UniProtKB/Swiss-Prot annotation:
PANTHER family: PHOSPHOTYROSINE INTERACTION DOMAIN-CONTAINING FAMILY MEMBER (PTHR11232), PTB DOMAIN-CONTAINING ENGULFMENT ADAPTER PROTEIN 1 (PTHR11232:SF78). This is PTB domain-containing engulfment adapter protein 1. The keyword Coiled coil applies. It comes from Rattus norvegicus. Detected throughout adult and fetal brain. Detected in cerebellum, cortex and hippocampus (at protein level). It is found in: Cytoplasm. Residues 21-176 form the PID domain. One of its GO terms (biological process) is phagocytosis, engulfment.
Amino acid sequence: MNRAFSRKKDKTWMHMPEALSKHYVPYNAKFLGSTEVEQPKGTEVVRDAVRKLKFARHIKKSEGQKIPKVELQISIYGVKILEPKTKEVQHNCQLHRISFCADDKTDKRIFTFICKDSESNKHLCFVFDSEKCAEEITLTIGQAFDLAYRKFLESGGKDVETRKQIAGMQKRIQDLETENMELKNKVQDLENRLRTTQVSSTPAGGVTVTSPSTDIFDMIPFSPISHPSPTSAGNGTQLPPIPSRSSEIKRDLFGAEPFDPFNCGAGDFPPDIQSKLDEMQEGFKMGLTLEGTVFCLDPLDSRC
C-alpha cells in the first residue's frame, strides 16, 4: 500500500434497507487475520496492520499454507465471519463496536475494519482479501451502521423508556404488596384480640368495659395515620385521634400512600442490561469512520 486510503466524497448505499434489517448480505473473502492496534481509528493505524498481516501471510504461504476462506454476513446486527461450509461463526463483530472501515485504492481486493473486542476491550484490526469487491463491502458495512444507528435512536430509546416505566411500576407493586401483607397481619391480630375480649351487656343495652384504661376491644386504639397522645372519654377509655384533612388526602384508608402510576419512580435496570445500553450508546456516539467520512447522525437523544 503506497498511499493512504482515499476519501469518498459522498455515500451511495448499495442495498435496500430491508436486506440489512430483516436479513443479511453475504460476501465471500479470504481472511488474512486480525491484529491488535492501539487506536480505534486512523488510516496509518490500519495501514500498519495490513502490512503486518500481509507479511505474515507471505511467510505462511511460502511454507505451503493457504489463506483461509470465510463468509461475511453483514446486517444491522453486525458483521459475522463464518466458515463457508460448516457455517460455524468464528467472529461476531457488533456494529456499535466497529469504529473504522476502509478499502485500499491501490489494491481493489483488500479491505479492513477496526472492532473493539467484547471480552478484552482491545481494538482489533481485521483484514480481508475480497476478490475486487472491497469497496462494495466497505459501503455495505457503512450502510448497516447507518441503519442500526437510526434504529437505536428511533425505537431503542422508546423501548428503553418503556422498560424503565414498567420496572418502576413493578417495584411500586412489590412495595404495595408488602404493605398490604403487614396490614393483613395487623387486622388478624385485632380479630384475635376481639375473640379473647370479655364484654358484658346491660339490660338497657349499654356496654360495660371491664377495664377503664382500654377501649371496647381491651386494647389501646389502633390508628394507622398518626400516634399523637390519645384523648380520654368520659368513661376513661382511650379514643383514637381524628386524622386531619391533609392526612386523609395523602394516605388511603390503610395508612399507605395511594398508588399513582404517573408519579411512581423509574426503576433501575439490572447492571448487565444497563452496562449493555451504555456500551451501545457510547459506540454509536463515537460513529463509524468510513474511509475518512464519519457516519455519525444527529446527537444521541437524551432518552437513550
